[in-house]
Amino acid sequence: MRNLKFFAVATAGILAFSSCKKEDDNNVNPGEGNPSNEKGIVSLHFDNVYKKVGNSIKLANDAKSEGTILTSANNQQHKFQTLKYIISDVSLITKDGKEVQYNHGDPNKGAQIINQAESASHHFNIPNIPVGEYSKVKFLLGISEEVFKKGENFQKEFFDKSTKEGMNWKWKNGYRHLRFEGFYGTDFSSAFKLHLGDKVASENANSIPGSIAIELPIKDILKVQKGQTSAIHIKVDLDKYLSGVNKITLSKTNEDIHSVVGADEFVKNIKEGMFSVDHLH
């Protein structure tokens, strides 16, 4: 009889353990160490457009050639010849606030140069994202000051790539986080350059980071599923360059900027409204 009781208790214990184990296996927490097979891929797409109407920006080869003509809120016309920026330190935020980071602090693995002239550069995949629901995407426009301070050898692969793309001023002066160039005026005879970079420290001044932290809500909620690829399309509205929070008129005083110094109005326009999540699929 004692043996029968022991067998019954033992069997109940095994069944209870089996039930708990099965329940635990199905309890996927997107922000915390899911099993490696409970992962998906997120593809980020950056669409450079004018006034969010879905029209891609066509670059002009020179002042006289065709290109998308943008008209600012101050009724000034301009067009882009070069449109490049760096994306790094991407994070996805779950509905309950947990952050999943993608190669933060390592531009060799986690940074991308978006170049309007190269369509293949407009999107990149982020693998091994835990399954779950995500309500925000964050990234850095540029490379952080902390990463730059790690030295050239640490980030040589990406720095060499940025050199080929014209996205740095050689090592001493750091990265061009963003590079907007083009022409403006009634006959487009005037040129503008916005090269957003750090103000590197000198004996008489402190360094000022030029990278910009961007955080975007995902209103429809991104659902990452096991073994599937989910896409986030981020619209980059170039109308905000001159017609964002600040209504800017290009002139001799602001047409040629080569660091974060003097770029306050442009930075505010970029940070507050240029980037938005358009749709998912």
Protein language model annotation of sequence segments:
Residues 4, 21-22:
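Low-complexity, intrinsically disordered regulatory segments enriched in Pro/Ser/Thr and acidic residues
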Residues 22-281:
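A short, solvent-exposed, low-complexity linear motif enriched for acidic/polar residues
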Residues 1-8:
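Bacterial N-terminal signal peptides that target proteins for export
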Residues 11-14:
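Alpha-helical transmembrane segments
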Residues 16-19:
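C-terminal motif of bacterial Sec signal peptides marking the signal peptidase cleavage site
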